[in-house]
Structures are given as structure tokens and as C-alpha cells.
């Protein structure tokens, strides 16, 4: 189910869309059609993630790749910012890390800093958002670059999509 409109959680969290209780909530205030498509695909990725947790995270490979990327990013950030102490070990969503990246660093600056490490600034937020950005890249991005930059994530997505296709 997809609901389009203005929802309190969007204003509270300053977001355009979210996935909750098997439904996607998306704002009707979009820059253009592609912006809405990107938001929908991103939230579909969270639905796929929720229903395939063991496959995605069971072997720990994706978490290790994510943390390795955070460890590459941390010294770059620490040149100008006070990086949270658990930044290099915490792969789960953490409000203080999210606030640090969004409010202190800012996504414009972070997009410049994370080039070649993460596919986008938002992918640095948590392993779940890393997964979601990878999902977007498979459908809307440069697959070859993504495959080189995020090999574990790319392989997980390719295997899961193949399995889902075979079972439908």
C-alpha cells in the first residue's frame, strides 16, 4: 500500500517518505516525477529488507563492508568535524550519527567527502540506508560503478533479486 500526502512523521523527521507497517508513506510535494520514483524505490527496498533480514544480514558480510567504509570515511570527516565515538563500530541506525551527518556535516558536503566510498551521503547513515541506496542504484543508477564500489552489497542484491524472480 502506498499513501501519498503530508504526514506528521515527515515533518517531525524532515523526510519525504518512510516505510512502516507494510505501507509506504510519501509526500505529495516532490521536485519532479523522478524524485517521487526514487522515493518509492527507496521505500520498497525497506519492505524487501524487512522480509529478507536473514538473507541480507545473516552472514554479517554487509555489515562488515559498511563498517569498513565508515572507517575509511571517519578520518576524512575528523579533519573538520568531531566524529561520534561509535561511528566506526555502529552499523545500526543511530539518531546522534544521523544528526551529525545531516546537521553538522550536511549532505552537500558529505556527498563530496564520501565520493568513492559510499554511493551517496545518505548511505553513510546506517547499514539499512546503505542497503536502500544500493537497491536504488540497481534500478536507477550506474550498475558498473556500483558493483566496483560496493561489491558485497551488489552481490547480495543480485542474488536476492535472482531468487525473487525465480520464485514468482
Locate each region found by the language model:
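Auxiliary, metal-adjacent structural segments of Zn-dependent hydrolase domains
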Residues: 1-37, 58, 75-89
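Catalytic Zn2+-binding segment of zinc metalloproteases
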Residues: 37, 43-63
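Short, charged/polar micro-motifs that form catalytic or ligand-binding hotspots
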Residues: 30-38, 118-125
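Conserved phosphate-interacting/catalytic interface
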Residues: 63, 67-79
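Secondary-shell segments that build the walls of catalytic and ion/ligand-binding clefts
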Residues: 74-102, 107-108
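Pan-zinc metallopeptidase signature
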Residues: 97-168
Amino acid at each position: 500500500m502506498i499513501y501519498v500526502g503530508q504526514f506528521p512523521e515527515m515533518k517531525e523527521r524532515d523526510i519525504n517518505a518512510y516505510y512502516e507497517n507494510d505501507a509506504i508513506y510519501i509526500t505529495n510535494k516532490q521536485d519532479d516525477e523522478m524524485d517521487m520514483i526514487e522515493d518509492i524505490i527507496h521505500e520498497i527496498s525497506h519492505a524487501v529488507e524487512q522480509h529478507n533480514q536473514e538473507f541480507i544480514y545473516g552472514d554479517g558480510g554487509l555489515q562488515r563492508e559498511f563498517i569498513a567504509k565508515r572507517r575509511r570515511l571517519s578520518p576524512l570527516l575528523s579533519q573538520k568535524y568531531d566524529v561520534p565515538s561509535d561511528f566506526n563500530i555502529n552499523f545500526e541506525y543511530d539518531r546522534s550519527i544521523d544528526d551529525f551527518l545531516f546537521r553538522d556535516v550536511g549532505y552537500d558536503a558529505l556527498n563530496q567527502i564520501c565520493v568513492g566510498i559510499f554511493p551517496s551521503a545518505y548511505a553513510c547513515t546506517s547499514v539499512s540506508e546503505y542497503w536502500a541506496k544500493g537497491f536504488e542504484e540497481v534500478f536507477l543508477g550506474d550498475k558498473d560503478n556500483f558493483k566496483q564500489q560496493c561489491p558485497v552489497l551488489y552481490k547480495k542484491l543480485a542474488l536476492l533479486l535472482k531468487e525473487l524472480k525465480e520464485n514468482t
